[in-house]
Amino acid sequence: MSSYIERIEAHNFKSFRRKKVINFTKGLNVISGPNGSGKSNIGDMLLFVLGTKSIHAVRADRLSDLVSKGSGNECSVSVTFRSDDGRSLVIERRLVIEDEPKSYYYVNGVRSRLSEIDETLASMGINFGTYSFVLQGDINDFISYSGQERRKLIERISGVDQFDSEIERVKADIEAVSRNMEINQTIIDEKRQNLERLRTEKEKKERYDALLKRKRDVEYTEILNRKNAMERQKRTIEGQISDLTKEIAQLEERRSDLEKRSEAIRIRREDVAKRIDDLTSGEMNRVKTDLHSVEVDIAKIRGIIDEKNRNMEKLEETIAKYESERDSTDREIEDLDRQIEEKAKRKRALEDRYADLKKRYDDLFSRAQAEAVDAAETRRKSKEYQEKIDGLGREIEELKAAGSQMNADLAVLLQKKAALEERKEDLDLKIRTSEWKAKETSEDMGKYSRKYYDLKAKYDQINDRISDLKSEISEKEASAKIASSRVPEYVRNVKMLEESVEGVIGLVRDLISYGEKYVKAVESAGGGRLNAVVVKDDAVAKECIQILKDRKISPMTFLPLNKMRDPPAQRDVGKISKDPGYLGILMDFVDFEDQYRSAVYYAIRDTILVQDIDAGRRLMGIFRLVTLDGDIFDPGGSITGGYRNYASDYASALRMQHDLEGMKIQLSSLMDDRSRIKREMDQAFSEMSEASRRTGEIMKEQEMLKKEAERSREELKQVMDDISSTDRAIADKKRMIDENEKVIEQKTLDLHKYQEALNDLYDRIDPEFFKNIGDLSNEINEVRSEIDAVASELNQITSRRDILSSERKHLEDQMIDTKLQENSIAAEIDDLNGKKRELEEKAKKYQYALNDLEGRYGNLSAQVREADKQIREMENGINDAKASIDLKNDLMNDLKVKAGILEGNLSSIERELSSYSGCEAVIGDLQAMRQEIERAIMDLGEINNAAPQQYEDALKDLDDYEKKHEKLMEEKKALEETTAMLNEKKREVFVKTFTDISEKMNYVYGIINGGTAKLIMIGSDPLTSSVEVSVTPKDKATVKIQALSGGEKSVAALSFITAVQILMPSSIYFLDEVDMYLDAYNAENMIKMISQNAGEAQTIVISLKSLVFSYASNAIGVTSVNGESFVFNGHFDGSPEAAP
């Protein structure tokens, strides 16, 4: 779809004072006029409306210069665009000069922002490319450009300047990274010096610790020798007790597992049963109710459509009746036309016969005069008598004919009066109907306008949210990138296994999700077990372990799902659930797929989540506990806690990635909402525009009807005046006829006298001759009477035809009104059919939903039956395990009694050995060893006990800085590669644009001049090269553009500009005196090419050359009177001087 400028309306803009309207057409529009008349101000109008950023673009020093002098403090310009499908778009800019100049933009009369203008133009298929406006001076600028300036021009055209800001940003990043590298290197040097000092102190402390340990080992060996004998006696009994304990624990675990599984199945069964109740009592009933409601609405709409169709049939019958009456009237008019033609033909034949008879009579009478005896006197008197007779006869006939014509005119006027009165009543009815339609349409437009701006407010709100979310995503992606760089080695190894072996599912931590509130609790409770790898089966685990061995990768823990035991039934937490600090079983706060339950249980076990460390202290001793802050309470009594940097580990990276995915889903949803609202906005805008268009059409129709009614009233008044005038004229004619009849009576007496005198004369002439004259006279009178009769009949038939034509016009108007009603009802039927289709589609969706719910009901019922079967099997296994446990406990009690006796003997030795934890037994002379160790300790002198930890901390710190240095080097390298890539991309885009323009320029120059022209790049690097223009005019040598004549330079520059226009086409072009320096040959070739292009894009050309107008589809003249510009549309006679 393409659009064009239909008209420009300016008020007090520059030299166009008051209101000026300029009309344009598609194709080539030529503007001409004397220099200084204001032609170029038309281009300034377009730039002003389109919101040019520079005041100098519209050839003004300040905004107040745009207002016509002496015209107040305000000016405005509106441009009407028309699309191929008939839509119109009016963009207006008003400038008010107050304390500060203010501009207001309007789209179709609605206040808008400048930023919305481009979107609105794009919706009409209107775009402006490079060189859409070629103003005075653009050609000379190109000719005078240096090679560097031409290159920069091509850079702007190609758009490569967009790369410059990115390249500068990357360079700034490189400088910042380099500065950070220098600072980091200085710190590394200082830390290396400190590390060497700590290394010496650490080695000294290690020697001291080794001596102390050896001394304690000697003491420990002396005690241990006393203990060994007693322990050998005890081991046998403990082994037996241990075996029994393991067997009992296994049986207890099996029983507990069966109880938990049984309870879990029972809970799942209750949940499924509840879901069945919810499904049957809630959602299915709602869907059935909604389906019934939609079916009722469909039936209602069908009834309305049937009623509308019956109305359509009635209207069609009315139209058929009007068409029949119109056809009958047309046949009668055709018959009258044939009668008029026959009567006119008969009248012309009679007039011809009358002329022939009159000529014969005159000939005979002349002979009679010639043959008279008293030639001189008799001829004179007979001629005088005859002229008087003829004159009286004609006068009488003319008076009678005038009277008859006036009576016929009066009849026509009376018929016309009746038709006008009927037409006036019809127009009054149409005006009232149109006013009602205008009110209804205006209300619709208000409704659509409110809807549009409500949607627009939502659209702006969502757009702002999208912008904010995109910023948040960018920040989150940057953080995620940093976090991803800290992914541990084992994670990358798991990724490698996933790619190498089918059946590797992933880390346990990757298969679970939980809220931010529970991060510390889950990470502490799971610990390293969260890094276990879940695989499909033990065969996959075997294959993975072999790969790790082959590649010398550290061991990993694998969890084959086919070998993992189901988690035991949940233990009864008892009274601790009533404690205010108790939160629940930790696994209940973690989300995962049920197939991975055994793997998740391996990591988290049956750990209980509590509020804080105080709650843990109250509840510790029976269950494993974890606080929200990550502190662990072991059933054996140990407490593990302290600071953890959870945010920096792999879990944090996963959560960040998860949050990022959620934000992207939210962004996608928002963008879908924005697209939907945009479609609704477009629909509302279309409805608003349609209502506005209908209102405009109705207002135009109202105006037209009012004007037509006014014309009818004036015409009726004129007819009444004509009737009165005709009545008076008829009365005057009657009076004149009466007077003439008296004169005729007198003239008849005179005629008898003349006749007697003639008879005396004729007695002396041949009687037969005068008989012929008398016969001719009688025949002439008869023909004259017949002519008058035919003329009277012709007038009557013509009057009847005029009356029938007026009746036919009235029938046509009634038919048009009826068809408009028919079209309105048809549109309503289309809308109702659309609503019916929407409801039918909605009913289908409800039916599909109902079918899906019934399927879900069947599946849930099957799950309940299966759960009942599993529960029975679990109860049987629990009873068997209890019996075995009782038997094992009896055996173990007997062994414990024996072990108690030995434990008492060893207790004193154990208390003594407890102070030597970590010591090892030695072999040799223990006394000599002790003396040697004590001397060595004295020789070491002062010891820094914190040296080992300080050394490790310093070593880790140095390693962190060295890794940071490596990352900075990698970052710098990546940034340098990015800079090179951007420069290469910029170079590619520039070279392609340069080549395309050069080829098109040569093509255009060949059409205009017949020669060749191209661009030449001077320099090895396109981005720093100089661009020259090489031209070979037809039949001339090749030279640079600077060496050409003025006209030849213009041809070359125009070729370049036209080449850019071809590559980056626009809907509309404005060319201001681009042919100024061209000779006739080149100017004509140029205008031919422009006129051909005008078939695809509207072109507005300002020119003073006469040959341009022979190619124009529209000519516009501009003249100036006392500094005020006037515009005239039309066709010129071929020269600009002819412009008004």
From Swiss-Prot:
It is found in: Cytoplasm. One of its GO terms (biological process) is chromosome condensation. This is Chromosome partition protein Smc. GO terms for molecular function: ATP binding; ATP hydrolysis activity; DNA binding. It comes from Thermoplasma acidophilum (strain ATCC 25905 / DSM 1728 / JCM 9062 / NBRC 15155 / AMRC-C165). Pfam families: SMC_hinge, SMC_N. Residues 502-619 form the SMC hinge domain. InterPro entries: P-loop_NTPase, RecF/RecN/SMC_N, SMC, SMC_hinge, SMC_hinge_sf, SMC_prok.
